[in-house]
Structures are given as C-alpha cells and as structure tokens.
C-alpha cells in the first residue's frame, strides 16, 4: 500500500513528504517533480508569495541511480520566505515584543476551530499548518505516484471550466480529441492558458473577473475538471466501504484546502433525470469489444473503474483571506472587529487543478496494487499486461 505524509509550516524552514510503499524500479528525477511544482505555482490571480518562492524538491532517500528502490522516499522543499519569518516562526527562542499574537479569526478559515481544538492563545500555528502552502509537498509526493502510473499507461490531467461567473460549456469535441491522446494532453493544452481554461472567450472573461475581484479586495473560486485515462475495469471493490474507488477518489479531492464539493461524471445532472436517460448502455463492437457511447457515470460503476475515462469535478470556494475584510471578533476582548488579512491569492483555482491531479495519483496506484500486487515495476507491468489481455480476449470475437 502506498501512503504519504507531509510536514512543515507555511513559513517554516521547509516542507517535507515521506512516500512509503512505492514499488522498486520506477524512473524518477527531481526535474519531473519540479515541473509539477512549477505548474502548481502558475495561474493568473496568485499572490505575492509566488514571487518569492521557486519551489524545487530534493530527494533524500528511496532512490538509487535514478530509480526507486522500494524503501521510503523522502522529499524536501525549502521555503525561501523562511528568512523573513525566523523570529515569528522561531522553533526554540521565546517570542519577543515584535511577535504579536493573532487573536482575530478569519471567517471561512481554520482559525477559530483550530484555536479551540488545540488550545492556542495565538492563531498563528493554525494558519501555518492549515495553509494551502502544504499542497506543494502533496504535489511532490503525488508526482512520484504519477510516474509509476505513467509507466503503466495511466495518465491524469485537468482543466478549469469556471472561475467565478466565467464558465464554459463542456468543449466536447476538443476534449474528446485530447482524451484520445491521454489525460495529460488535456493538462498540456490547459497549461497554455493563464487560467488553465480550454476556451478563449471564457479565458478572457475569467481574467477580467479575477482582475475585478483584485481591485475590489475580493477573491474567486471555481470549478476543476479532472480526468484519468488508461485505467482498466475492475479497480476498486463493492465488497466493503473502505475499498470503494469512488469514495477514495472523492475523499482525496475533498481533502484539498478550499475544496467544498466533488462530483463524479454528471452526477448532479443525472439526479434530475430518469434512469433511462442516465445509465451508459453497452454496445458490442467486433473491433473494440464492449463500448459505451456515453460516460455519464464518470468511469466508475459499482464503486469500481468501468474502463472508461474517470471524470471528477471539484468545486473550490473563494479563498478566505480578503483584503476587504468581513466582520469578525477578537477572541480575547470579545469585541466585534473587521477580520484581518493574511497575504494570499485572489484566485488559486488553476493551481488547485494541479494539486487535484497529484492527490488522485496515489489513490489509483493503490487500487492498481490491490488488484495486481507486486513489488517491482517490471513485475507489475507484466501482470497488468496479462490482465488487459484477458479482458480483451474475453470480449473480442
């Protein structure tokens, strides 16, 4: 089983991740991880932090001669901004007079509940760990799993379909063509846009919406479309709740900071229709075997992969730190006061798409290993090839 843990504070010395359970024999370089980290930093509407950081990952263990060796992989990303926070985030020295406590929670953030939960008299520790800066470590960890999947013909990609009220209808023909190449083709096309959108008109509207929100001291959320191609049918299980692939994928998406909703396929549209207009019918093809002409289920049926493209949609709320503050209160004086501003983005939806790709990779990798087993890439590839061939021979005349 692949699992990973992250550590580090937003303005601490570094972020780190330990990835355990990765099979041996996977080719990996810092360059591939750094490419994904750079993608995470892109997007119109990002804040001043992105001008400071230039995220690079260092691999400290689990790799020899450019290949994984089956032992835990340690990844470290240094925080360049740490040099400006050595007093506020000192690990051992006592705070001086300049290190004032934060006692005003921001609506929509972890501030108040985190302070209550851990008994802090200062909200700063809550801000530091709940920050979406942590997702840099998750992108690094997820990239390792992505490289494993890519070596087996499984790809993950995303694009942004809405930012604020700037939304585009599904670009069906363009999307269909890209997905035939693999999900990464969707991501490559999206990355050409500063808001990771596929339609030019919607991109223009989104850019204007972000600029308008920035001028007003406001923030914007949006909708992320994520695709996974190359997954054969039968990954996951209906037998127990904790083996359901749809549940694991949804949990991974909803674990991303500021993500408040997840949809599989066209689930919410399906809920308004009769079953005769929803379920993806089977068709038999002499050349292709069993095919579907629709994919409203999003590539998941009975909590297992169906063999179609897996499609998830994530809803990201507007970021909680606003230049124009909402109403809050001081937890020490219990006096009403405007909320405080913590340096943040106007819109981070494009970056969240990259994070979504990363967090789904370990989920698919675990479903694959649960089905096939194996400790070395060559062993697993051989088993997957046999599994795919058994499916092909069963349904082809």
UniProtKB/Swiss-Prot annotation:
GO biological process, one term: aromatic amino acid family biosynthetic process
Keyword DNA-binding: no
Family annotation (SUPFAM superfamilies): Chorismate synthase, AroC (SSF103263)
PROSITE patterns xref list: CHORISMATE_SYNTHASE_1 (PS00787), CHORISMATE_SYNTHASE_2 (PS00788)
Function summary: This reaction introduces a second double bond into the aromatic ring system.
Pathway annotation: Metabolic intermediate biosynthesis; chorismate biosynthesis; chorismate from D-erythrose 4-phosphate and phosphoenolpyruvate: step 7/7
Enzyme Commission (EC) number: 4.2.3.5
Signal peptide: none
Cited Pfam families: Chorismate_synt
Cofactor note: Reduced FMN (FMNH(2)).
Any one of the GO CC terms: cytosol
Cofactor: FMNH2
Membrane-spanning parts: none
Protein name, as recorded: Chorismate synthase
Family recorded in the similarity comment: Belongs to the chorismate synthase family.
Alphabetized PANTHER family for the sequence: CHORISMATE SYNTHASE
Keyword Nucleus: no
Gene3D superfamilies, per the entry: Chorismate synthase AroC (3.60.150.10)
Organism this protein belongs to: Pelodictyon phaeoclathratiforme (strain DSM 5477 / BU-1)
InterPro entries (UniProt xref): Chorismate_synth, Chorismate_synth_AroC_sf, Chorismate_synthase_CS
Binding, FMN: 129-131, 257-258, 302, 317-321, 343
Coiled coil: none
Enzyme class at the top of the EC tree: lyase
Highest classification ranks of the organism: Bacteria, Pseudomonadati, Chlorobiota, Chlorobiia, Chlorobiales
Residues annotated for NADP(+) binding in this entry: 40, 46
């Amino acid at each position: 089983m692949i699992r990973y843990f992250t550590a580090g504070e937003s303005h601490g010395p570094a972020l780190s991740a330990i990835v355990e359970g990765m099979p041996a024999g996977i080719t990996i370089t810092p360059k591939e991880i750094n490419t994904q980290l750079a993608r995470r930093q892109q997007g119109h509407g990002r804040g001043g932090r992105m001008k400071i950081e230039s995220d690079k990952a260092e691999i400290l263990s689990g790799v020899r001669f450019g290949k994984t060796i089956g032992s835990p992989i340690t990844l470290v990303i240094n925080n360049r901004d740490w040099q400006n926070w050595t007093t506020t985030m000192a690990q051992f020295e006592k705070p001086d007079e300049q290190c004032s406590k934060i006692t005003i929670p921001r609506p929509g953030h972890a501030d108040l509940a985190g302070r209550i939960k851990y008994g802090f008299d200062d909200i700063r520790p809550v801000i530091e760990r709940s920050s979406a800066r942590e997702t840099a470590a998750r992108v690094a960890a997820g990239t390792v799993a992505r490289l494993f999947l890519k070596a087996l013909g499984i790809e993950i990609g995303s694009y942004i379909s809405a930012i604020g009220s700037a939304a585009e209808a599904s670009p069906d023909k363009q999307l269909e063509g890209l997905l035939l190449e693999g999900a990464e083709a969707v991501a490559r096309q999206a990355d050409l846009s500063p808001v990771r959108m596929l339609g030019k008109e919607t991109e223009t509207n989104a850019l204007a919406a972000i600029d308008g929100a920035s001028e007003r001291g406001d923030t914007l959320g949006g909708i992320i479309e994520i695709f996974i191609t190359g997954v054969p049918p039968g990954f996951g299980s209906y037998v127990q709740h904790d083996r359901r692939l749809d549940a694991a994928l949804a949990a991974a998406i909803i674990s991303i900071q500021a993500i408040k909703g997840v949809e599989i396929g066209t689930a919410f549209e399906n809920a308004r229709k009769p079953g005769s207009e929803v379920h993806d019918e089977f068709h038999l093809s002499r050349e292709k075997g069993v095919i579907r002409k629709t994919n409203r289920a999003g590539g998941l049926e009975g909590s297992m992969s169906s063999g179609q493209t897996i499609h998830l949609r994530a809803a990201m709320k507007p970021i909680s730190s606003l230049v124009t503050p909402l109403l809050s209160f001081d937890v020490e004086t219990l006096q009403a006061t405007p909320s405080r501003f913590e340096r943040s983005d106007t819109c981070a939806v494009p970056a969240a798409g990259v994070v979504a790709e990363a967090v789904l990779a370990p989920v698919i990798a675990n479903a694959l290993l649960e089905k096939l087993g194996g400790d070395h890439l060559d062993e697993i590839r051989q088993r997957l090839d046999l599994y795919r061939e058994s499916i092909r021979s069963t349904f082809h005349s």
